[in-house]
Design a protein with these regions (language model features):
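Extracellular pro-sequences of secreted precursors
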Residues: 1-188
Length: 188
């Protein structure tokens, strides 16, 4: 029996970015985001994260996206880098913002793509499932020329083949021990 491929579509909308002054830097906000890129010394950029779940045994074949032509925006200052994490102790520590030369001297965009994803396996409601975690980056930053590009709409398409049968795991397992033949007599 041939399993038909299915497609899920997720459409997201973001507003035009707002530029906020922050000392010698700026930061960007956009309605429609729910998180930020949080890598120390790298630009603090808006992002949207969501996780979808599929029954165990589902094969995710492709995750693609479509966007309109990105809009360009010139920034008055560099985007603020995230500070280094501070230790959890009772001493005073000043937060340091050290722009990563690896990123801030680049002519290519950061983070580099409008979407990334990971496929993992875990439990949801105590049942094994496939998790598809999506990260959408509606703002791309060109640090060397202090310019940004942003999108307001993205359509994500997930192509997958559903599980061919229910892969529920039994509650009781037999014990399987894999060992060299040298030890097999001791295990019996």
């Amino acid at each position: 029996k041939r399993i038909e491929e299915k497609t899920d579509t997720l459409g997201l909308h973001f507003t035009q970015p707002t530029i906020h002054e922050y000392g010698e830097y700026v930061y960007i906000s956009m309605a429609g985001i729910n998180s930020w890129l949080t890598n120390p010394d790298e630009p603090q950029l808006p992002c949207f994260m969501t996780t979808l779940s599929y029954p165990l045994g589902t094969r995710i074949d492709a995750v693609t996206y479509a966007i309109e032509t990105p809009q360009k925006i010139t920034l008055p200052k560099q985007i603020i880098p995230l500070s280094q994490p501070l230790p959890l102790d009772r001493l005073y520590h000043s937060s340091k913002r050290l722009p990563s030369s690896r990123i801030y001297n680049e002519t290519s965009p950061y983070p580099g793509d409008y979407m990334s994803y990971q496929i993992t396996v875990g439990l949801e409601d105590n049942q094994p499932v496939i998790f598809l975690s999506l990260q959408v980056y509606p703002f791309q930053y060109y640090p060397k020329i202090n310019r940004g590009e942003y999108i307001q709409d993205i359509e994500i398409e997930i192509s997958y083949k559903p599980a061919s049968k229910n892969l529920n795991m039994p509650d009781i397992y037999d014990l399987l021990i894999i060992t060299p033949a040298l030890f097999s007599d001791n295990l019996q």
